[in-house]
Amino acid sequence: MATGKIVQVIGAVVDVEFPQDAVPRVYEALEVQNGKEVLVLEVQQQLGGGIVRTIAMGSSDGLRRGLEVKDLEHPIEVPVGKATLGRIMNVLGQPVDMKGDIGEEERWAIHRAAPSYEELSSSQELLETGIKVIDLMCPFAKGGKVGLFGGAGVGKTVNMMELIRNIAIEHSGYSVFAGVGERTREGNDFYHEMTDSNVIDKVSLVYGQMNEPPGNRLRVALTGLTMAEKFRDEGRDVLLFVDNIYRYTLAGTEVSALLGRMPSAVGYQPTLAEEMGVLQERITSTKTGSITSVQAVYVPADDLTDPSPATTFAHLDATVVLSRQIASLGIYPAVDPLDSTSRQLDPLVVGQEHYDTARGVQSILQRYQELKDIIAILGMDELSEEDKLVVARARKIQRFLSQPFFVAEVFTGSPGKYVALKDTIRGFKGIMEGEYDHLPEQAFYMVGSIDEAVEKAKKL
């Protein structure tokens, strides 16, 4: 085991000098004793002259030149398998929940090759989420990739928590949750939410929070992914939740300049597309098992053309766009039904009835959008009878797209609802065909199925 010494420390980036004949390979892990702590470094570049440039997987406070560094001669390895379920780990797979050792039987390196073409499999099966707007407008494929796009505070994390809860309870599969650069408070809430709904023993949690150095945030997504790959290779259907994929990009940006790379557009790292591709290509389904991934994507300044969300779009099967305008109307989940898309919304996959209903809902909402200007200037009275009907139905549809969440019961005070896909289609079809024209639009707000709306109307 070769040893070297630290020659330079700049923030999270540490240069280490080794003997010329024992230079560590790129992505190998190094260890340095920093006071009482053992700090892990990951090799990023070989600079020549026996010097390697590394990223610290923890705080580099207290490091000094001349400290001895050991080459572990393998990449960072993390525990995988059933022992990780119900536990909270950091980027190195060390437990941070004060519950003792993980007790794993196997450790895997976090850097792995993506599955080959022969191993890949595609599936047309739908994954029912119980959330009306998602199941109807942008259905998820089992083994597909979903992005939740939204600016700050429109509900990405709450939507994700609801998805995990619904899928864990209704489908009883394993999930891996990678918290990448998010708030520690959310991580804590998330753990307690999972414990309260009794699904914690089906979820592995890996956290690299906002307050941690960029090295942790850059690699924690790979740690979570490696755990998910193990479950997949055992022949399971596993869910991988990443909150937030933008922070993964951001951590790369933070270390990119320190690693001596020229910045590209908007100051992002020049390797943005490649880093995203390396991660996304591993999140895939094979003939053995499937990984369905749901990724929250923060949209800086609500600008979907920013290089980071724009790069993410290319990898996804379904995009759920959360809109600030819809949130400001008090409609939650604040999913924009005209902006959200899914490759699965195809009559050959979802069936003709589902397809026609979804497209019908979109056309009514689109027409309402066009009429809004006329209403604002001239008022409702100037519209034709036909348009008045469209507006009335559109407003009912808009309210019916809202739904009380289980994970938000504490805030809303109303019990959560899981709505089966057939009930969702029946409800929206009925509204479009005019079966519920006699009901007031308030009856459709924050209910589950259409039957609840009818009941609510009797009380109004």
Swiss-Prot record:
It comes from the Bacteria. InterPro entries: AAA+_ATPase, ATP-synt_VA_C, ATP_synth_F1_bsu, ATPase_a/bsu_AS, ATPase_alpha/beta_chains, ATPase_F1/V1/A1_a/bsu_N, ATPase_F1/V1/A1_a/bsu_N_sf, ATPase_F1/V1/A1_a/bsu_nucl-bd. ATP binds at residues 150-157. GO terms for molecular function: ATP binding; ATP hydrolysis activity; proton-transporting ATP synthase activity, rotational mechanism. SUPFAM superfamilies: C-terminal domain of alpha and beta subunits of F1 ATP synthase, N-terminal domain of alpha and beta subunits of F1 ATP synthase, P-loop containing nucleoside triphosphate hydrolases. It is found in: Cell inner membrane. Transmembrane segments: none annotated. The keyword Secreted does not apply. PROSITE patterns: ATPASE_ALPHA_BETA. It is a peripheral membrane protein. Keywords: ATP synthesis, ATP-binding, Cell inner membrane, Cell membrane, CF(1), Hydrogen ion transport, Ion transport, Membrane, Nucleotide-binding, Translocase, Transport. GO terms for cellular component: plasma membrane; proton-transporting ATP synthase complex. Its EC number is 7.1.2.2. It catalyses: ATP + H2O + 4 H(+)(in) = ADP + phosphate + 5 H(+)(out). F-type ATPases have 2 components, CF(1) - the catalytic core - and CF(0) - the membrane proton channel. CF(1) has five subunits: alpha(3), beta(3), gamma(1), delta(1), epsilon(1). CF(0) has three main subunits: a(1), b(2) and c(9-12). The alpha and beta chains form an alternating ring which encloses part of the gamma chain. CF(1) is attached to CF(0) by a central stalk formed by the gamma and epsilon chains, while a peripheral stalk is formed by the delta and b chains. PANTHER family: ATP SYNTHASE, ATP SYNTHASE SUBUNIT BETA, MITOCHONDRIAL. Belongs to the ATPase alpha/beta chains family. Produces ATP from ADP in the presence of a proton gradient across the membrane. The catalytic sites are hosted primarily by the beta subunits. This is ATP synthase subunit beta. It comes from Klebsiella pneumoniae (strain 342). The gene is atpD.
